[in-house]
Amino acid sequence: MSKVLILFGSSTGNTESIAQKLEELVAAGGHEVTLLNAAEASADNLADGYDAVLMGCSAWGMEDLELQDDFAPLFDEMENMGLKGKKLAAFASGDMEYEHYCGAVPAIEEKARGLGAEVICEGLKIEGDASSDPDAVSAFAEDVLKKL
């Protein structure tokens, strides 16, 4: 059994719905899961005590990538989270009309790799909430579970 932190930033509730579904699926896989809203989190040693971290954040922007307001400060301080040696996967909801559709996924993955985290599967990108593409959410959870 692994201890898994699911950290999310959500403005409209779409990313939160994905995080909640992932919490349900990962817990059903026999793992201890903590769901944490970025609005209630501090970057300092956030990953301590966890084997894996799933990070979800909505993003948008026509020219520059804009991360969700509560998640952006945590992203800026990711080096303080203690991610070195941790397993990590990223997920996002987005709107395909924006140039940076689900741009949080590659941004999180790139920064996490640079900090010594192991990105364990391809990130999940969904337009809308968890009910928009339940098969994609389930497949992502299965990929994560295989690597825990």
From Swiss-Prot:
Name of the protein: Flavodoxin
Keyword Transmembrane recorded: no
Domain (Flavodoxin-like) ranges: 4-145
Signal sequence bounds: none
Keywords noted in UniProt: Electron transport, Flavoprotein, FMN, Transport
Family: Belongs to the flavodoxin family.
Record-linked InterPro entries: Flav_short, Flavodoxin, Flavodoxin/NO_synth, Flavodoxin_CS, Flavoprotein-like_sf
Gene Ontology MF, one: electron transfer activity
Names of the cofactor(s): FMN
General function of this protein: Low-potential electron donor to a number of redox enzymes.
PANTHER family: FLAVODOXIN 1, FLAVODOXIN 2
